[in-house]
């Protein structure tokens, strides 16, 4: 079984916990679904096909933090765009279209990912992309 080992890092990251819709908090590390999404973006697989193309049922993922996990909260202004605004997103009189929501982010996250058990063609494609430093889609944390 071939294992791919590579680092991912960024200025900020957020891996939203699904049970926190009103005040989004983040996992301290990328969950397996996020790692599979990153792999799909690197390899260039569409979001509707990457699970099957990678072989997610047999995938084995390990994550090792390479920097201390530092979290912070920031209030984000959300703008309601369905009702109450015109086509230029200007609020109509008497209607509040902004909502401030505190989001939790990770500051300067850095992780080493260990990935094994992928389909052979997907492993070869990922290894080639990683070795050349290219991605098909932009990877975000």
Please identify what each model-predicted range represents.
Residues 2, 18-89:
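Glycine/small-residue-rich interface belts in oligomeric ring/scaffold proteins
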Residues 3-8:
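Short amphipathic
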Residues 11, 25, 102:
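Glycine-rich, flexible loop/turn motifs
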Residues 11-12, 46-48, 96-98:
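Short secondary-structure boundary micro-motifs
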Residues 12, 60-62, 110-112:
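Structural motif
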Residues 12-18:
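Short N-terminal binding/cap micro-motifs at the start of the first secondary-structure element
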Residues 66-141:
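Internal, well-folded beta-alpha domain core
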């Amino acid at each position: 079984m071939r294992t791919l080992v590579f680092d991912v890092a960024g200025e900020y990251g957020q891996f939203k916990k699904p049970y926190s819709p009103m005040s989004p908090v983040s996992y301290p590390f990328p969950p397996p679904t996020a790692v599979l999404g990153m792999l799909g973006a690197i390899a260039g697989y569409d979001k509707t096909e990457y699970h099957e193309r990678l072989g997610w049922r047999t995938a084995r993922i390990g994550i090792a933090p390479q920097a201390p996990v530092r979290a912070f909260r920031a209030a984000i202004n959300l703008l309601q765009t369905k009702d109450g605004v015109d086509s230029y997103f200007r609020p109509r009189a008497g209607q509040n279209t902004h909502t401030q929501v505190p989001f939790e982010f990770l500051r300067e996250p850095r992780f080493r990912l260990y990935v094994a058990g992928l389909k052979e063609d997907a492993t070869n494609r990922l290894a080639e992309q990683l070795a050349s430093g290219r991605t098909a889609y932009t990877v975000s944390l």
